[in-house]
């Protein structure tokens, strides 16, 4: 990082609470009874303030504290990230730094000696969900997700009912036994929360097993559209669009790992996921919410937000200059070109029913600093623990942490 002109600066550990997406860890303030410090979930606001103060390239190995549930790639409590920010920078500038820094490290110190070379592949969020069923696809797997919604329209099979999205994952030359298929489908249902279906193509080109009986009148059409041949196994998912996509993504990964010849495991395959939606409809609230980082610059700036406010543009069609770095199906980091203009920031929050007073109350230091003028800036923060997990070839992050917490954060 220093070779790229970055200056290492440490930011405060005892700070004020700020909405970052998880719950805070609080520390009582001895001299101020009834008040608390918060441990930082990320140095997000601090590093943006550094850009405003004239430090054009910052980095640190930043400790982050989040009270959130454990996962295979997420340890509860604390973790570390290679936090960086660049002034007068674009998305491409951020990509260029990490594409130069990371591959040599992974090739030299990783369990596998092959790593993607620059430039990393770029995939839009929409294409990632449509093609891989995931916004963190494992590109070592050569299987893809196909849409078969129109192909099964009018089917008597209840999950294919009108309004549902139907996805398929085709595996050529698959000799998986019925018992193994049942176990794989059960594992997918546990992980995705939705049941997958399946059928096979026999030597005569007929559909057999699973849900084949519901597709007999559409055999020729489905065969042509999906490119099926004798010996193919077809995994199928159905449901609301996002649920069907995500279940297909889990199914794709499980099949790629289970069926020989479809996963080149001994390599590090990086990619960028770009063009994330700025907004989404909240599952619980049913109202418009930020999809990811509220500090991201919308693609189209103030003009696109004003059009959305007037009803000329659907807010769900607004994209953010946000990106994720993914390696072997693991999200290493999220980053963004930041929203450095207070007018655009306020307008972005107004679309989710928060006004200027709310922005000032939630982000007073950053809002005030931006009012004096801030340079365009962008950044990212790859997770150090996750990188070490990949370097060591481990599937669980707790295996590489010297004193890890358990799933109950103990």
What are these regions (language model features)?
Residues 2-410:
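Class II aminoacyl-tRNA synthetase catalytic cores and aaRS-like
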